[in-house]
């Protein structure tokens, strides 16, 4: 199989762009997609995002997290540089940890319409407590809906040893 042609990537504008603009306000419109060349196969795509930051909506203090985004694509896939810039746009966004994870998941569902997706944030402790919100989605009426239920019930059965992240 030959690699992707330039015409296949016409909607991917941020990758390789040396004039990248970093947006400091929540910007879902920066997300870009490309076609999944393997839509007849189930497979996971996982992003490990260790530099996520947002702001506490009450105090304005920064929150830091590693975010794990895993999804099973259908027809469209998120382009990784646009995802990086999108996550960066949360830098000055004031929202609770749980809200940030659900907003990210909802934006990616709207963008890609994946078969399945999960977003897990592992935030560094503040005030001696770390918060690790997990959300997922499986396309209704399909095996992915059942998969989402199963993974929700079993996603964190083994407590981790916290070493201050």
Swiss-Prot record:
The active site is at 56 (thioimide intermediate), 63 (proton donor). NCBIfam families: QueF-II. It is found in: Cytoplasm. Pfam families: QueF (PF14489). This is NADPH-dependent 7-cyano-7-deazaguanine reductase. Transmembrane segments: none annotated. It catalyses: 7-aminomethyl-7-carbaguanine + 2 NADP(+) = 7-cyano-7-deazaguanine + 2 NADPH + 3 H(+).
């Amino acid at each position: 199989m030959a690699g992707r042609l330039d015409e296949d990537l016409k909607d991917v504008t941020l990758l390789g762009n040396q004039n990248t603009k970093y947006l400091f306000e929540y910007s879902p419109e920066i997300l870009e997609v490309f076609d999944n060349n393997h839509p007849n196969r189930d497979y996971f795509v996982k992003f490990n995002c260790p530099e996520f930051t947002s702001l506490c909506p009450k105090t304005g203090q920064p929150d830091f997290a590693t975010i794990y985004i895993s999804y099973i694509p259908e027809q469209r896939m998120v382009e990784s540089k646009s995802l990086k810039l999108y996550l960066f746009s949360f830098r000055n966004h004031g929202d609770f940890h749980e809200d940030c994870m659900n907003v990210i998941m909802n934006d990616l569902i709207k963008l890609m319409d994946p078969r399945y997706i999960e977003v897990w944030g592992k935030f560094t402790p503040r005030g001696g407590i770390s918060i690790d919100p997990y959300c997922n989605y499986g396309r209704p009426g399909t095996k992915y809906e059942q998969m989402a239920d199963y993974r929700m019930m079993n996603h964190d059965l083994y407590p981790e040893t916290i070493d201050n992240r």
